[in-house]
């Protein structure tokens, strides 16, 4: 409720100068509801304007379940098919979007979202509307530089040249620079790798605990390794770092250490489940929901108690769903 009032006070508006997307534009949407005719969505770059993905435009292949293709709450990249600005109808397609299109649109949306967040913050700070700041500064920068984020990046080094001719005060210019510098600061990446570790021998849980402990011990000043229980024998190795390659290498090293150690015990074995992934957004939320069922790895025996069969099957289904969605994304 508070967020809605803030948006109203700021007069929140679209990212770009044009009021409607154009035919053949790639845009980012959020799925609101699914009905017989299709999926109704909010167009995120155009102030949550409503559009519809027709059922015939969901997939090139036949499908039995709509939920396997699209889900309420998910973000999707779609192509604009038709725009009726008078009636406000916007028809969209998901099936005509290629993997390259998705990457291209996600990169553009990420850049535009950074700019929009900066605009909202600065507008609130100076008591003006988002649209007013867009009209005076941001939209002219889009026209001049192709993308306002590229302009603001250059402004951090050459502000006089970039802001020349814009009808904004020095205070607003300084606020724009201060905010965008913070948003351009490299953010730590979160990576995770799923593993199965078990021991049917005499040492059992103690062997698993020892192997996981060895895996955690490879942490250093640059990369910290955490290992958490999903449901026996499933565990997840998680790390956070600025260097993706370094983080992936460290998780692989932890996996090798764990594998080597558990195999020293009779009946002990190790299996990697899937690839090492960068997590964030919806994927991070799904992982947190899974981990909420169990505590992280510690010296307590409770962390290694076997869940009942229903809990284990439920966790496996959640993980499989997560992988399906990652492939769709």
UniProtKB/Swiss-Prot annotation:
GO annotation, cellular component aspect: cytoplasmic stress granule; eukaryotic 48S preinitiation complex; eukaryotic translation initiation factor 2 complex
CDD domains assigned to the protein according to its UniProt record, in alphabetical order: S1_IF2_alpha (cd04452)
Stretch list, region Disordered: 291-329
Outcome after substituting residue 59 to A: Loss of phosphorylation by eIK1. Loss of interaction with phosphatase IUS2
UniProt KW Cytoplasm keyword: yes
Post-translational modification: Phosphorylated at Ser-59 by eIK1 in response to amino acid starvation. Phosphorylates at Ser-59 in schizonts and gametocytes but not in rings and young trophozoites. Phosphorylates at Ser-59 by eIK2 in salivary gland sporozoites but not in midgut and hemocoel sporozoites. Dephosphorylated at Ser-59 by UIS2. Phosphorylation of eIF2alpha subunit of the pre-initiation complex eIF2 inhibits recycling of inactive eIF2-GDP to active eIF2-GTP by limiting the activity of the guanine nucleotide exchange factor eIF2B and thus, inhibits protein translation.
Biological processes per GO annotation: regulation of translation; translational initiation
Keywords, alphabetical: Cytoplasm, Initiation factor, Phosphoprotein, Protein biosynthesis, RNA-binding, Translation regulation
Subcellular location: Cytoplasm, Stress granule
Residues where Phosphoserine is found: 59
Biased composition (Acidic residues): 298-329
GO terms for MF: ribosome binding; RNA binding; translation initiation factor activity
Annotated S1 motif domain residues: 24-95
Coarse class of the protein's main subcellular location: cytoplasm
Family: Belongs to the eIF-2-alpha family.
Purpose: Functions in the early steps of protein synthesis by forming a ternary complex with GTP and initiator tRNA. May regulate protein translation in response to amino acid starvation. May regulate protein at various stages of parasite development.
Listed name of the protein: Eukaryotic translation initiation factor 2 subunit 1
Source organism (scientific name): Plasmodium falciparum (isolate 3D7)
Phylogenetic lineage: Eukaryota, Sar, Alveolata, Apicomplexa, Aconoidasida
Gene that this polypeptide is encoded by: eIF2alpha
